[in-house]
Amino acid sequence: MSAFSEAALEKKLSELSNSQQSVQTLSLWLIHHRKHSRPIVTVWERELRKAKPNRKLTFLYLANDVIQNSKRKGPEFTKDFAPVIVEAFKHVSSETDESCKKHLGRVLSIWEERSVYENDVLEQLKHALYGDKKARKRTYEQIKVDENENCSSLGSPSEPPQTLDLVRALQDLENAASGDAAVHQRIASLPVEVQEVSLLEKITDKESGERLSKMVEDACMLLADYNGRLAAEIDDRKQLTRMLADFLRCQKEALAEKEHKLEEYKRKLARVSLVRKELRARIQSLPDLSRLPNVTGSHMHLPFAGDIYSED
């Protein structure tokens, strides 16, 4: 991948489109350069505010993709986006229409469902998006309309994934957190003192207490990071399950279509074969003109009309 620079990032952000491929491509580039997460977030926020209203939502889609897909690599982006994400939500919400707010609400729901941020940050995001509005009362008819729309959207099948995307998702899971033997060993080797509250009574001086505190902090960081990676792996496996289901559905539909086509062409072959058989039989029943006498090439003289009708 190309080297990181703020100028390169600004250029890539200026070329960012609303397509899934564009967002995912830039997201992968950013995650690859995650050691520059702080300047990346700074440039992202600056360019977000400069972007036209119809492009601002795409910036948040990019942030969402980076935050969620970088979790298995490390917590850098989740932490560095946290101080600016609330104001970013507020800015985009104030600059765009209600349709855009619905999409922002969907992103927020996913973050809440997957515990991307702590509850206090999620509450701030809700306030930035919805303000102090209370749930408005709706008539029974309005509720039924919303339910029907939701059912319709949930029931509509997803687009099947490209084969390359499916292969990439499977390859990503080859290095999943659950297979990290080194971390498993580190967790298994944690001293019992960091896991049993009852053992705190054995601390008799400040020095040993501070030493244990350092061990507990390290254990917390190790376990929190690994839990985050496992949560990301679970999300990846859920996504892969959906991708496989969509792919299988698509293949079943394609199979049914091709079987139908095969039957159709079998019938056509049968009709053409019948024509060929009948044609061969008809050809066999016709006279062979090549066996008739060659009238034009012989020396036989045909009689003249006068000879035929002459009187004796």
From Swiss-Prot:
What Gene Ontology cellular-component terms does the record carry? Answer: nucleus; transcription preinitiation complex
Q: Which residues form a coiled coil?
A: 244-286
The compartments listed are: Nucleus
Location of Phosphoserine modifications: 153, 156, 285
- UniProt gene name: Rprd1a
Outline what the protein does: Interacts with phosphorylated C-terminal heptapeptide repeat domain (CTD) of the largest RNA polymerase II subunit POLR2A, and participates in dephosphorylation of the CTD by RPAP2. May act as a negative regulator of cyclin-D1 (CCND1) and cyclin-E (CCNE1) in the cell cycle.
The UniProt keyword set, sorted, is: Acetylation, Coiled coil, Nucleus, Phosphoprotein
Q: Write out the GO biological process terms.
A: RNA polymerase II promoter clearance
User: Which species?
Assistant: Mus musculus
Where is the PTM N-acetylserine found along the chain?
A: 2
Any one GO MF term held by the record is: RNA polymerase II C-terminal domain binding
Name the UniProt record assigns to this protein:
Regulation of nuclear pre-mRNA domain-containing protein 1A
Q: Which PANTHER family match?
A: CYCLIN-DEPENDENT KINASE INHIBITOR-RELATED PROTEIN (PTHR12460), REGULATION OF NUCLEAR PRE-MRNA DOMAIN-CONTAINING PROTEIN 1A (PTHR12460:SF2)
